[in-house]
Amino acid sequence: MTQFAFVFPGQGSQSVGMLAEMAANYPIVEETFAEASAALGYDLWALTQQGPAEELNKTWQTQPALLTASVALWRVWQQQGGKMPALMAGHSLGEYSALVCAGVINFADAVRLVEMRGKFMQEAVPEGTGGMSAIIGLDDASIAKACEESAEGQVVSPVNFNSPGQVVIAGHKEAVERAGAACKAAGAKRALPLPVSVPSHCALMKPAADKLAVELAKITFSAPTVPVVNNVDVKCETDAAAIRDALVRQLYNPVQWTKSVEFIAAQGVEHLYEVGPGKVLTGLTKRIVDTLTASALNEPAALSAALTQ
């Protein structure tokens, strides 16, 4: 079997009805959601299957839902005798999914932790004052320059380096709008405002990170059974304090996804499996390293194909 890695998606990959087909085939999916529901005090499976979407899309509910979906798929993989990946990585919230699957954080602890992470993020910025935009077709340096020149005393910066030519910026809503216009003037094909209420991974998230650090200190961290590439430094940490520190800094620093995928490829990995709903990371992979292949493990046929590789 070729060397493979598991990657875990972040916010934006959720949808009402996600994993329904997997749950119909593998009871462990609903069992995993039942565990999460017990930790949270509400029926998370009902929310993911019935919605409404505006509830599922609230960040403090999105985050536990995506984490649980990824852990459920990982458990299906293990139950079916799937081999261990060479590496793991997750995009933003997905880093928590990776750490659970690598045995670093207990699942119930992680579910409660990411719910709090979502609440802290929402509390850090008053509703309607933050924004995010995807900048398509402009180099990283030009985007950084546009952000610097558009700040005017407010916060705006690149926050997700998703693939070459696809970078997300975040900060104060007006500054994001100015920077988007500056990026277009500098040659960007598009500046797409994203329908989010929280400007993730920018300096406005520092108060949320400080609160998160307090909660992270209460949780036991174990050594990873599989190396996890972190978002903030593109490193595989084994020490609990270093993993905690990277999670705190992740909240107000950019997600280095392009570099993470390049790092994974440099370790001899040839295929990425996306473990979670949607196919966002699968779509980004080829744009980052064209020799890498990728596929999503969220449907029974795709899972069966992967298990027979």
Swiss-Prot record:
Coiled coil: none
Any single Gene Ontology cellular-component annotation: cytosol
GO biological process: fatty acid biosynthetic process
Active site (record annotation): 92, 201
Reactions catalysed according to its record: holo-[ACP] + malonyl-CoA = malonyl-[ACP] + CoA
Domain of life: Bacteria
Keyword Iron recorded: no
Enzyme superclass (EC): transferase
Keywords for this protein: Acyltransferase, Fatty acid biosynthesis, Fatty acid metabolism, Lipid biosynthesis, Lipid metabolism, Transferase
EC number in record: 2.3.1.39
Pathway: Lipid metabolism; fatty acid biosynthesis
GO molecular function: [acyl-carrier-protein] S-malonyltransferase activity
InterPro entries on file: Ac_transferase_dom_sf, Acyl_transferase_dom, Acyl_Trfase/lysoPLipase, Mal-CoA-ACP_Trans/PKS_FabD, Malonyl_CoA-ACP_transAc, Malonyl_CoA-ACP_transAc_FabD, Malonyl_transacylase_ACP-bd
Family matches, as NCBIfam families: fabD
Family from the record: Belongs to the FabD family.
Entry protein name: Malonyl CoA-acyl carrier protein transacylase
Species assigned in the record: Salmonella typhimurium (strain LT2 / SGSC1412 / ATCC 700720)
